[in-house]
Amino acid sequence: MNKYRLSDETRLWHWQNGETKSVTPLRQIIATTDFNDVLCGTKGGWVEDERALAQDGQCWIYDENSVVFAGATISGNARLTLPCMVSHHAHISGNCWLDGAEVSHGARISDNVTIQNSSVRGDCHIYGNARVLHNSMIIAAKGLTPDQEQILKIYDNATVSQSRVVHQAQIYGEAIVNYAFIEHRAEVFDKAILEGNDLNNVWVCDCAKVYGNARLIAGFDEDAIPTVRYSSQVAENAVVEGNCVIKHHVLIGGQAWLRGGPIMIDDKVVIQGRARISGNVLIEHQVEITDDAVIEAFDGESIHLRGEKVVNGESRITRTPLLGAL
């Protein structure tokens, strides 16, 4: 037994893909039986044809300003509330909830996912109990990295809010991403927290990874943007705060704490233990900082450490060492 019929009335939906303008006739869904919280006779959104909304399951398009077209499908128990646009072979299934969302161009949304006031575009899969909230933009694109087949994924219990996630990035576990920009093949997972604000985002790019209980926290001053790039990793209980740029093959772990600025760490540097780094500091070329070591540049001064050396124990450095002093 069908749960809805299509209206005799049609509505022309004008849309544009690149420079190509198109018009698609849509028809409104009208419930023909009571199911879930939908009463017989209730009018819903507009679809291109019956393939857009499954006749079985509890799925429904609640808002009369929602549209589903261009090969997109809604199935299972999925719900669309507030005006939503689902198009271009996007597939919404399971117990998903779309609320004021736009999903298109091959995106797959399944399981118990929530997409609220956000857009998802491109060949990606968002599943599990993941949430994408508060004007986030998910823009998937394959082929921009050496891995031609990897697709963007957000899954498990990950939450993305006020953020942009693009290319082939991966966010999963219990990760919380707020006011951040994640691109290329970057990964954020476990219980990592990225906490930007309305002035400064957190950036994780290239093949960088943030995981464990690590935290990246943006400040409110100009350029107080924590940035992790290339193949660098921030892990365990490390905290990176403010104007910090982490570049090539850097590992920050333990309970290390970095507060810029600005701080730049580059080229196979390892920072772990309970190390503390703050102020205007440049560390590069295979330096290891561990234990309770402190690198602290006072206001108006800067520190530059480079070359193969280990700073450990309770060492405290407040100025650039003389050549050969370490």
Identify the residue ranges that each predicted region occupies:
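Terminal amphipathic alpha-helical/low-complexity segments used for targeting or macromolecular assembly
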Residues: 1-58, 64, 77, 89, ...
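Repeated polar recognition positions within modular binding domains
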Residues: 62, 69-70, 81, 97
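A detector of tandem-repeat and repeat-rich interaction/domain scaffolds
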Residues: 71-79, 83-84, 89
